[in-house]
């Protein structure tokens, strides 16, 4: 986002978290390795494959411990839906 209040609203809203959890569930359904869930998420959100660096960082993040009641894949989804690449069309 381009403004701090907008970014904070998107990151902290219940709607964004609900959508992130739904996206994580959709990407996890039927995906064997964690990497496939990440690839699905990128395809759905950005219509492209993740770069090697994006894939490495995402796998590292998803493999880490969860914080609170939100699983790491849902946290990743929340972060990705708040990227400018998702919010704005070039």
Q: What is the predicted function of each stretch?
A:
Residues 53, 69-75:
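Surface-exposed patches in mature extracellular/periplasmic domains of secreted proteins
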Residues 33, 66-69:
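Solvent-exposed, well-ordered amphipathic alpha-helical segments
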Residues 56-66:
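Amphipathic alpha-helical segments that form the core helices of the histone-fold
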Residues 1-45, 49, 75, 80-90:
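An acidic, gly/pro-interrupted, aromatic-rich
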């Amino acid at each position: 986002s381009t403004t701090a209040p907008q970014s904070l609203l998107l990151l902290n809203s219940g709607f964004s978290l609900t959508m992130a959890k739904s996206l994580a569930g959709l990407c996890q359904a039927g995906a064997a390795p964690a990497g496939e869930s990440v690839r699905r998420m990128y395809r759905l959100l950005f219509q492209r494959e993740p770069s090697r660096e994006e894939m490495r960082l995402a796998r590292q993040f998803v493999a880490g411990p969860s914080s609170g009641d939100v699983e790491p894949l849902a946290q990743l989804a929340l972060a990705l839906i708040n990227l400018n690449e998702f919010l704005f069309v070039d």
